[in-house]
Amino acid sequence: RVIRLVLQWAAMYGDLLQEDDVAMAFLEEFYVSVSDDARMMVAFKEQLAELEKTVKQISEDAKAPQKKHKVLLQQFNTGDERAQKRQPIRGSDEVLFKVYCIDHTDTTIRVPVAASVKEVISAVADKLGSGEGLIIVKMNSGGEKVVLKPNDVSVFTTLTINGRLFACPREQFDSLTPLPEQEGPTTGTVGTFELMSSKDLAYQMTTYDWELFNCVLELELIYHTFGRHNFKKTTANLDLFLRRFNEIQFWVVTEICLCSQLSKRVQLLKKCIKIAAHCKEYKNLNSFFGIVMGLSNVAESRLALTWEKLPSKFKKFYAEFESLMDPSRNHKAYRLTAAKLEPPLIPFMPLLIKDMTFTHEGNKTFIDNLVNFEKMRMIANTARTVRYYRSQPFNPDAAQANKNHQDVRSYVRQLNVIDNQRTLSQMSHRLEPRRP
C-alpha cells in the first residue's frame, strides 16, 4: 500500500517533485529501502521495477535541458504566442519585471516567480545602488496602496489588472502616485471587434481560458487556501486565471463606457449578450460569468436609455443569464447548471476558491493534536472537481474560426481595460447624466 501510494504521488506531482530537493531525496532513499526489502519479500519485486522506472524518469526529466527555468516577460503577456502550447509557470521560472520609483522612473529586475518581497527588495537595491529602508508597495489604478510584507510571495501575479509595484523609502510612502498608464485606455475598440463574429470571439476566449485553466496546478489551490507564505510556493497559474475573470468583467464595462454613441452602445450590449451565450455553449463558465457580471456592473446597469433600446429578446436572454448568478442557497442555480455539464468544462473559479476558504476557515486543521482528516477530505473534494472538469481535452480544432481567426485570437488575449470603478462610474454619468 505504501509503495502504491508513493507511485500515485509521484505520477500526480512528478514535475513539482523535480523542484523539491527534499522530495527527490526521499524518493531515492525510498527506492533503496524497497530494494533492500525486496530481497526478502518476493511480492515487492514487481512494484520495485515500477518504482525504479518512476524514480529514474523523474530524475532524468529534472536534468533535461527543456526543464530548465524559463524567463517570462513583464505582466506575463502571452498575446503574441502562436501555435505554441502554453506551459505552466513554475516557481523556479524567472520574470523580468519593472519596479517603479516615486518619480515614476523604473528599474527592471530579474528574479524567480516565487521570489519573496525580501528578495525583490534585494534585487531592486542592487540596481539602485542602495536599499536602506526600502519597502515594496503594490498600487492599483485608483491609488490604493499596500505595503507588502517581507515574506509575501507571488507578488507579481497577485497584482490587479492595472496594478504596479513601487519601491521607495518608508518615509516617501504617502507621496506615491499611480502612473498615467494605469488609468487604462481612452478610446474603445468597438471599431475592431464589431467586425468579428460573436461566435469567433467566444471560441477564442474559450481557447485562451482553457489554456490558463489547464495550467493551474491542483496544489496551487492548497497554497492559496492555507497561505502561500506557509509553503513559500507560487500560485502564479491560479492567479493569472483568476485575473482573467476580472479582465473580462472590466473589458465589458470599459467598452460600453467608452462608447459615446447610444445606438453603438445598444449594439455593444447585444454583442456581449451573444458572446456570453456562445461561451455558455462552449461550457466556458469563466468568461460567461465574467461578461454577465460586467453587464451588471453599476456603471453599466444604470444606463437606462441604453437598456431601454435593447430588444426584448436580448433582455430575456440577459435575465436568464443573470438568474444563474443568484447567490441564494449557496449559489444553487450555478451549482445545478455546472452539475449537468460534462467535461471539458471551464468553471467559475472564484466560487471554488470560496468553497475551499470556507472549509478551511470553518474547520480546525488539528483536533487534539491530530490531523482533521474530515477537513482534508472536503478540501480534496474541491480539488477533485477541478481534475474532473479537465478530465477530457478541449479540442481547439473542433470549431475553427473563419479567415480572421488570428486577429480575433490576438484581440482576446490583449484586452486593454479600465479597472478603476470610480473612473467607470464617472464616465457612465457623463454618457447618461442622472435624471432629475
UniProtKB/Swiss-Prot annotation:
It is found in: Cytoplasm; Membrane. SUPFAM superfamilies: Ras GEF (SSF48366), Ubiquitin-like (SSF54236). Residues 1-59 form the N-terminal Ras-GEF domain. Signal peptide: none annotated. Residues 197-434 form the Ras-GEF domain. One of its GO terms (molecular function) is guanyl-nucleotide exchange factor activity. Keywords: Cytoplasm, Exocytosis, Guanine-nucleotide releasing factor, Membrane. InterPro entries: Ras-like_GEF, Ras-like_Gua-exchang_fac_N, Ras_G-nucl-exch_fac_CS, Ras_GEF_dom_sf, RASGEF_cat_dom, RASGEF_cat_dom_sf, Ubiquitin-like_domsf. CDD domains: RasGEF. Pfam families: RasGEF (PF00617). One of its GO terms (cellular component) is photoreceptor outer segment. It is a peripheral membrane protein. It comes from the Eukaryota. The keyword Signal does not apply. GO terms for biological process: adenylate cyclase-activating G protein-coupled receptor signaling pathway; adenylate cyclase-modulating G protein-coupled receptor signaling pathway; calcium-ion regulated exocytosis; cellular response to nerve growth factor stimulus; ganglion development; heart development; hormone secretion; insulin secretion. Interacts with RIMS1 and RIMS2. Probably part of a complex with RIMS2 and GTP-activated RAB3A. Guanine nucleotide exchange factor (GEF) for RAP1A, RAP1B and RAP2A small GTPases that is activated by binding cAMP. Seems not to activate RAB3A. Involved in cAMP-dependent, PKA-independent exocytosis through interaction with RIMS2. This is Rap guanine nucleotide exchange factor 4.
